[in-house]
Amino acid sequence: MALSKKKRAAQYKDLDLDVRSEIADLFRLLGDPSRLGIVYACLGEPVSAGDIARMLKISPSLTSHHLRLLKVARLVRSKRKGKQIFYTAADAHVRRILFDMAEHALEHEHEHEESSA
């Protein structure tokens, strides 16, 4: 059963400093456009680091560096298949956060387009 907005707000209102710091660190990680692009690339089917690098037009070594940081933060997970490692979003929470962020940004974009017309 889903919590009401009021109950959910009350539940998270008094998060301690350690939890708030962890959340801030996650947002800092996602504040880098390359890392954010990597996590978005991992939302669908499992994808290799090389494919991510090609999609985002960034170097394979930088892609690997970002993937290591994102794995430590539990935003992506990896699975080895043969000689390759494939990456996916870590869980439904991560997918929901990124979908909601994109919808929020696109909603603002649509509002801006409508007011310009």
Where are each of the predicted segments found?
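Intrinsic disorder/low-complexity segments
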Residues: 1, 58-61, 75
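N-terminal helix-turn-helix DNA-binding core of bacterial DNA-binding proteins
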Residues: 17-61, 85-93
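Generic structural signal for conserved hydrophobic packing positions in ordered secondary structure
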Residues: 31, 63-66, 101
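Alpha-helical residues within the helix-turn-helix
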Residues: 54, 65, 71-72
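Alpha-helical and His/Cys-centered functional microenvironments
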Residues: 69-70, 88, 112, 116
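Beta-hairpin "wing" of winged helix-turn-helix
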Residues: 71-81, 88
